[in-house]
């Protein structure tokens, strides 16, 4: 019985240490979540403004591309439009690229499994052959997952900061745009967990390349005229990659927010489970100790009675 009591006591001590660790991790994740939520809100204001400017500047290019798509003639103007604003040009889709965002480590609940399960279902539904798609992975969990299943992983990036910066994203965007221009894929979807609230996230797949979320009708009734130097083509060649960068950066910020929320929830759940286990073990320990004391008292009383 004494050995059993010691075993229970060791389990209680071990569980308390685990609970302290998970509680500390919960507090760290909560602090990161609060910080990135504030940055994400500020970034959304910037992103909306960039989108507005790009829509105004690219309105003429979008209209020319739309007219060119409806026409069967190959004019010099059409080739000029495509060369200046290639990121806006839609082309026949022979291969699709998927940029999948996961975490670099576990302890985030179902965060990674939700994304990867949805991705595999998406591939199964939309593609008949592995030659129809190519994978890009941000995060070690996703990269290892695709490698283990023999999928065509053309690019991987590990070690994104808990609070991402533009400098990190530039390398990713540059690679994605280069692969798009070189015909590695004809369209790119960014797939990640969208942050809804602390307890909820939802899988999202957004088309990033070619840029297709610019609506000319938004500027149709405005009379804004920009004075552009040196010329519109040069400005578009500079600002369109920056806009693509802002789109992907926004997706990474959103995914990281969902990751920290999932980590906070998972660690809170682990801490609660540890406390419940400690309570159960403490009750078990007290009962065992009470039984041991009762046995000792019974033995003493029995021995005393035998001496009479």
Swiss-Prot record:
Protein name (Swiss-Prot/TrEMBL): ATP synthase gamma chain
HAMAP family, per the entry: ATP_synth_gamma_bact (MF_00815)
How this chain sits in the membrane, per its record, is: Peripheral membrane protein
Disulfide links within the chain:
none
Fill in the subunit field for this protein. Answer: F-type ATPases have 2 components, CF(1) - the catalytic core - and CF(0) - the membrane proton channel. CF(1) has five subunits: alpha(3), beta(3), gamma(1), delta(1), epsilon(1). CF(0) has three main subunits: a, b and c.
**UniProt GO MF annotations:** ATP binding; proton-transporting ATP synthase activity, rotational mechanism
Quick one: a GO biological-process term for this protein? proton motive force-driven plasma membrane ATP synthesis
């Amino acid at each position: 019985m004494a050995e059993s009591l010691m075993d229970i006591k060791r389990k209680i001590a071990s569980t308390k240490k685990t609970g302290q660790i998970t509680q500390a991790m919960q507090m760290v994740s909560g602090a990161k979540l609060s910080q990135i939520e504030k940055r994400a809100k500020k970034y959304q204001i910037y992103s909306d403004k960039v989108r507005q400017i790009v829509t105004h500047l690219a309105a003429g290019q979008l209209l020319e591309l739309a007219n060119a798509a409806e026409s069967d003639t190959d004019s010099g103007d059409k080739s000029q439009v495509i060369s200046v604003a290639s990121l806006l040009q839609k082309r026949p889709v022979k291969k699709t690229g998927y940029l999948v965002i996961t975490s670099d480590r576990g302890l985030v609940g179902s965060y990674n499994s939700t994304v990867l399960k949805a991705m595999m279902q998406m591939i199964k539904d939309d593609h008949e052959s592995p030659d129809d798609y190519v994978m890009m992975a941000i995060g070690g969990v996703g990269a290892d997952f695709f490698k283990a299943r023999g999928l065509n992983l053309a690019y991987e990036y590990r070690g994104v900061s808990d609070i991402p910066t533009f400098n990190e994203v530039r390398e990713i965007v540059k690679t994605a745009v280069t692969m798009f221009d070189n015909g590695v894929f004809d369209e790119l979807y960014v797939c990640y967990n969208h942050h809804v609230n602390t307890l909820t996230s939802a899988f999202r797949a957004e088309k990033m390349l070619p840029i297709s979320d610019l609506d000319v009708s938004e500027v149709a009734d405005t009379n804004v005229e920009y004075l552009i130097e040196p010329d519109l083509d040069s400005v578009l060649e500079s600002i369109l990659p920056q806009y693509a960068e802002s789109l992907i950066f926004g997706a990474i910020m959103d995914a990281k927010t969902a990751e920290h929320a999932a980590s906070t929830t998972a660690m809170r759940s682990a801490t609660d489970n540890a406390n419940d286990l400690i309570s159960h073990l403490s009750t078990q320990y007290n009962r065992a100790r009470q039984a041991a004391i009762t046995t000792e008292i019974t033995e003493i009383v029995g021995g005393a009675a035998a001496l009479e």
